[in-house]
Amino acid sequence: MMSKVKTRIYFCGGAGFRIGELFHGYHEDVCYIDTSVQNKHKHNTDDNTIIIEADTKLADQTARKRAIGMGKDRKAAAELISAHIPAIAHHFPAGDTNIVVYSMGGASGSTIGPSLVSHLQQQGEVVVSVVIGSYDSDISLRNSSGSLKTFEGVSSVSKVPMIINYHENVEGIPQSMVNQNILEVLNALVILFNQEHQSLDLMDITNWAHFHKHHDVPVQTVQLHVCFDRQEAQAILDPISIASLYTDPDRDVSISTVLTRTTGYADPEKYDFDQMHFVINGLSIEDIRKRLEERREMMNRAKANMRKRQSTLDVDDQATSSGLVFD
């Protein structure tokens, strides 16, 4: 069992593993959880990785444990994964703060991630999810939509707002650009959570994330926006909670009227950023929901309009038991 750390990062599923590989060397307290050995990379070790195996029937009807992934089947993934979550959380215990990284469009990550978040939040831990919505296929779109609903379910069950930092895989945007944005967010969160800044302690971070404990607000899914200047932060509609970091205290200017605001001052000799703002709001979740709905409507129209061809078989053709046909 690992000891308590300041920030634990959990990389879940295939997308999580790929991000974790890119993030290697930036933070040491990381771990990986998946259902497929095919997603393992050179930085995975027995100490930092758990691969959940499923009972699989072979051709001779014998059963065998195999780690071959879940084929984007979220229901099957949930049936396999749910019983393992307490043991995973025990093996990789929560840090003072926690980041969980996964895709919404697959199966393993989109079930491991929210299940782990639910478990940790029910233990009172501070958790932020960094998630990737996907529109590239019908099943990825349906899984992303189901994941968004799952986040609301996790909020309801844990009685803690589920905080997501949201990214999208969409046409015209290279995967490398999406990955780079995620890496910037992870670096920023690790800095925010490192407990090294003047006037910003762990309780300040806890109050920022668990704003619902001090204000009469709905316990729902909320979105975290990571902003690198004041104008960007001010553009976020209806902010609920803001944490800000400055390397120059004289740059500290009120951004907006919010329920919770906490500010810290980072060492300018150690960090080269001017300011960072971590803005939580709820209204942006509605934008995500609408985009997913619009995409599903487009997908349904495309399926309905898909041309169907006539079979090459006619009523007189006879197929063998193997499907062979002789003209």
UniProtKB/Swiss-Prot annotation:
Binding-site residues, GTP: 14-15, 107-109
Record site: GTP hydrolysis: 201, 204
Gene3D superfamilies, per the entry: Tubulin/FtsZ, GTPase domain
Family annotation (InterPro entries): PhuZ_C, Tubulin/FtsZ_GTPase_sf
Highest taxon listed in the record's lineage: Viruses
Main enzyme class: hydrolase
E.C. number(s) listed in UniProt: 3.6.5.-
GO molecular function: GTP binding; GTPase activity
Reaction equation(s) it catalyzes: GTP + H2O = GDP + phosphate + H(+)
Biased composition (Polar residues): 318-327
Function: A tubulin-like GTPase that forms filaments, which are required for positioning viral DNA and capsids in the middle of the host cell for optimal replication. The motor component of a partition system which pushes phage DNA (encased by protein gp105) to the center of the bacterial host cell. Also required for movement of phage capsids to the vicinity of the viral DNA and rotation of the encased viral DNA at midcell. Forms filaments during the lytic phase, which position phage DNA at the center of the bacterial host cell.
Written domain comment of the UniProt record: Consists of two domains: a nucleotide-binding N-terminus that hydrolyzes GTP and a C-terminus domain necessary for polymerization. The domains are bridged by a long, central helix. Interactions between the C-terminus and the following monomer drive polymerization.
Name the UniProt record assigns to this protein: Phage tubulin-like protein
Species this protein is from: Pseudomonas phage phiKZ
